[in-house]
Amino acid sequence: MIHDPAQLERERPDRLRVLWLSTLAFTLMFAVWLMFGVLGVPIRKEFGLSDVQLSWISALAILNGSLWRLLAGILADRYGGRLVFTLMLFFTAIPAYLVSRAGSYEELLLYAFLVGFAGNSFSVGIAWNSAWFPKDQQGFALGLFGAGNVGAKCQPLIISTWRPHFGSS
């Protein structure tokens, strides 16, 4: 922990950059993690799924987003939040895209499970921001980072705006 006020002041722009970028990344990850709540009805119609089948898709994403949180936090502590968050963004983007290319219910289940890794981003961001902020500023920083949960509320607006441009109504 840094106790020298001059050193803290020099690092302030870096801390704020970490905070804003991690909050933006968490917003994106949270939106992806919960995307089946918004996309569920169109997916059910397109694939002719039952309510139970659709609920399995959402459940797999949510479950996987909960299973690995401890490990994700440990990895962030060990290798740094920037690396772990970047890898999570990249490796979650692939199955998120593949959801749009899925041709079967089984593929949707697989991609939903893989998309679920996005739910572990909370642990990574908390560890990352905690390492960058002094104790007396962590409450503000972690509160702002946690506001990334708004990603779930941004989905309907974003998806309803983009879907018509990708061949779906």
Segments the model singles out, each with a brief description of its role:
Residues L67-E106:
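Conserved MFS/SLC helix-loop-helix module at the cytosolic interface between two early adjacent transmembrane helices
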Residues F145-S169:
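Helix-loop-helix hairpin linking two adjacent transmembrane segments in secondary transporters
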Residues I43, L75, W162-R163:
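Hydrophobic alpha-helical transmembrane and interfacial-helix anchor sites in secondary transporters
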Residues A25-F26, F30, I62, A96, ...:
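Helical-face signature of the major facilitator-like transporter fold
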Residues R17-D51, A72, Q155:
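Extracytoplasmic
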Residues L34, I62-L70, N120, K153-C154:
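Residue-level signature of mid-helix packing/kink "hotspots" within the transmembrane helices
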Residues S55-I62:
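Short hydrophobic/aromatic, small-residue-rich stretches within specific transmembrane helices
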Residues Y111-G148:
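Cytoplasmic helix-loop-helix junction between adjacent transmembrane helices
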